[in-house]
Amino acid sequence: MQIKALSVSEINHYIKRIMINDPILSNVYIKGEISNYKLHSSGHIYFTLKDEKSRVSSVMFKTNTEQLKFLPEEGMQVLCRGYISLYERGGLYQFYVDHMEAAGVGALYLAYQQLKEKLEKQGYFDGKFKKEIPLIPRKIAVVTSPTGAAVRDIISVIKRRFPHVEIYLFPVLVQGDRAAPSIARAVELLNLFGGIDVAIIGRGGGSIEELWPFNEETVAEAIFSSQVPIISAVGHETDFTIADFVADLRAPTPSVAAERVVPDVKEVVERLNTLKDRLNKTLVKSIDAKRNQLGIIKSNYYFKNPLNMIYDRQQHLDILMKDLTRNINVKNSLYSNNVHRLGERLNSVSPLSVFSRGYALAENKKGERIKTISNVKLKESITVQLIDGQLSCEVTNILKEDKLVGKNQI
């Protein structure tokens, strides 16, 4: 009897067909903990699902990872849907995941928390980046659904409070998968529109799924990058979205946003009237003060006789000139006396004064002064400086210790 043997590839392919055609393995939900999580450069993620006793290798391809509302992490409990099949080349069976959500905590809530933490670390919520809302805007952009109650509330409140402001509606989708790109694009357009002073972005309340576009990163980036100040007005008072944290001002509802974006024209008029009255009173008070000051000046003696003031100043100037001249003469006399005394002191220590008393100064040929008889020799030529000239002399005798030393004496 001849035994028919299968190749490794054939047996793996056969097992794979069995798995694919199995009604349970072809569409199965598995709950477990993520382990050995790896995000490949291709966008695929590879991980292991495990519990206390077992584990299964798993993969989720890029086309499915792009639909995730949160970022899977090591140790996270998840509920995955997919199918079991064999990786023929390695002979290993794998769980091919096409849907994943966080177990216990909703996937949307987890995604919300993750994005909030990420943007907060990047400074998106920092107050130093918040732009000031203009006090009285002229042009207001409204980014919302053109058919919802929010747009009617916003326009109604703005027109009631400040009728002359211009409102520009940028219609967008406010829920669904296409809403986030629609909102982000509208923010870009209102910045390109030109002349917009402030924008309101919002919608009425709803579930977390309905409000989710305002939790998308693309919307947060558009709001953060906007040069036009943004007021967010999403949902009800208790609803906080990522857009609320990034926006320059958060309003709990669209109606409140409309109230905050413009002042009440009646209050503005009252305020202007109050300022007008205050300005008039201040001007009257200032004019009265200046009038009194002018009256005092006009009653002044010199104002009535201006030439007398000139004469008085001239007389005062003459007195000052006399005092100045006298002081200069006194100083000159003092300095002259000082110079004379210093000159006398200088003359007293001058060599010339020594000469005038009959003394002389002797030097050898080198110009060295002769201070003692030990500095000269017999027959040495020396120069003697007198008060009125010099003498060239030859030493013929040296008197030492009261004795005359002659040429024959040593």
UniProtKB/Swiss-Prot annotation:
It is found in: Cytoplasm. Pfam families: Exonuc_VII_L, tRNA_anti_2. InterPro entries: Exonuc_VII_L, Exonuc_VII_lsu_C, OB-fold_nuc-bd_dom. One of its GO terms (molecular function) is nucleic acid binding. Signal peptide: none annotated. NCBIfam families: xseA. This is Exodeoxyribonuclease 7 large subunit. It comes from Alkaliphilus metalliredigens (strain QYMF). The lineage of its organism: Bacteria, Bacillati, Bacillota, Clostridia, Peptostreptococcales.
